[in-house]
Structures are given as C-alpha cells and as structure tokens.
C-alpha cells in the first residue's frame, strides 16, 4: 500500500531484489518483530543500516503506520536528521535502508568524554533546534524528542526515531498522546496540543544538559506526569554556574501556555546563542557528569526491568501484544494512549493563566531525583518506534 503522495516522493520502493544492491555484513540488533543489519551498498561502496521488519503477522493498520513513518522521514533532508535512502517490500518483510550511525546516544557520549560545558550545551541545542525548525517548516512534528533519540555522529547531532511523528496543519490542534514522561509537554497529557510540544521537550533536554538532572520528577509514573502537568520547576543551587541567558531561554521553552511558547526559530534567535559564555569550571562539569551518569543509568535500568517483565507475561494473547510493543508497533487501529471514548481534557492553565511561564517552585520542595525513572513504562506502550537505527532495538 502506498498513497499518491508517496508514489511521487523521491524516496520510493525499490522493486529490485535486496541482494542486487546490498551485501549483508552483520546483525547489529534484534527485536521481536525485526532486526537491524549492517550492509554494504554495492553501487556506492558505502555502509548503510537496514531495518528488516517481519510483517507476516501484522495487522494492515500497523503496516500503514510503517509506511506513514517512511513517508514522513522521506520528506526530510537535513544534516541533523537521520537520512532514509529507500525501502524494499516483500511478502514477508519490509526493508528500510538508512544511513548507518555508529555514534552513540547523546548522554552516553557526554559521560564517556567526562567533560561538558555550557558552551557544549549551546552547540548541541543549536543543532537540535535547527533540525526541529526544519521539521516544523515541513509541517512534521516529532512528538518524542529525548536524549535517546539524539545521536552524536562525529561532531554532528543526528535526530532519529520518527515513529510517532506526523503531519500537522497550522492552527489545528492534535489530541493523541505520544511521548516519554520526562520530556512530554503538559498539553499533550491534556490531549490538546500543537507542534510546540517539541519545543517543551527541547527545554527539558537543555535543562538536563546544564545540570545533569530533569526538571520534573516523581516517585511513580503517575506522580511524574502529574508534576509535568503542574509544570512547577526550579533552578536552585545546581544552576548557580549557569548564565542568566540560558535560564531565561529554558524558562521560555517551558512556558505552560503553548500558544505563548516560542517557535524553534524564535529559540534560535535567543541571545544565549550569540552571547559569549564563560567556560564551565572543571569541578562543576564533573558534578554535572555524575548527575547525568546516575540519571542515565537508572533510565536504562528501568527500561531493562520493563522488558524483563514483558517477557514474563503469562497469557499467549498478552505475549503477542507485548511482542508488538517491543517491536515498537502499537497493536490495533489506534496506537495512541488516549482510551477509547475518552474525552480530551483541557489544560487548566490554557487560556486562563496570566503570563504563561511554567511556575517555579521553591528548590526545597524538589523530591530526590531518580526515584521513578519510568520512561519505559506506560507511556512507552503508546510508542511506534521503527527507524531508531542504533544497532539495538527497543
């Protein structure tokens, strides 16, 4: 199945046998419904990644979601976004060919290099926002921006994982919930949002880059998301070394009223990116790395625990559903978190709050970080993740 728009897109289905143009080298990662392999593209002699998705037991709707992701990503050609080359379709599999990204995830790379400054944060965020500005100009919203979906390839940032992306229309709200608890915008949880949900996620990422800890926490998944809805955060002592302009940008990006939240272009024009920033002292940098190491480790541990329990599910039907979820495909016709018949809830601050900036709470009110890093939990069940080619699968 392909629609007319896809047929005229330069990224088209390759009707030739895969083996004609590609020589499979090795398997990089496996999942319940697919695997990623490294392959040599014979005409160009360059290495690429191929995601092989077994579609024999997939519903038609799930296949359509795969093609929707291919369509969205094929519209994008930007140095900070993973590149898709082509795809193959057989009776058994869909083969999606992308550039091979050997670099690691953003946080892992920062931890490995043992040094990260505000100057580095500005350079990183500038590339992320540049990619998001490009996406939004193409009327595509990512909807699951987070450090795991930001790779470092050499000196270049690459955004991946467009499984939850979609086309949007100007001045038209979206209502289906997608995202990861730490980075999800409050209006998404209230099922009324626009493309600026990506800006909120960037604001959370920038906050973490500058101190190593998230602005919102909770002892459970539910508490975490309730805190996101309240949008109360603080800078406190851990931001004493951070410039006022950086904090001002974060405050703008975490504006509760998304209508008043800046666009990616607005953010890129912020004075923080043009102001000379004092280099972060080494002892402060080391503290950030230690915070980040703890946060990153617990996030990955929680994901591993989640996958373990998925594999222990008792019933055959539940295992079938879990396998789909592990492959990143949401079963059924609706892959959204919003329940059937659920009425969209309106954010209490939308249209009624003065000022619009996220309310900052007293630093002493903050709970200890890392107690409930649940990003692999309930929200992950709503994700449709197919093109995050990192040599491993969800």
Residue ranges and their predicted role:
Residues 124-125:
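Activation segment signature within eukaryotic-like protein kinase domains
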Residues 349-362, 385-394:
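Amphipathic regulatory helices of Ca2+-sensor modules
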Residues 35:
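Conserved N-lobe ATP-binding subsite of Hanks-type protein kinase domains
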Residues 87:
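Activation-segment/catalytic-loop signature of the eukaryotic protein kinase fold
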Residues 92-105:
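Conserved short submotifs of the Hanks-type protein kinase catalytic core
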Residues 47, 52-76:
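Conserved N-lobe beta3->alphaC-helix segment of eukaryotic protein kinase catalytic domains
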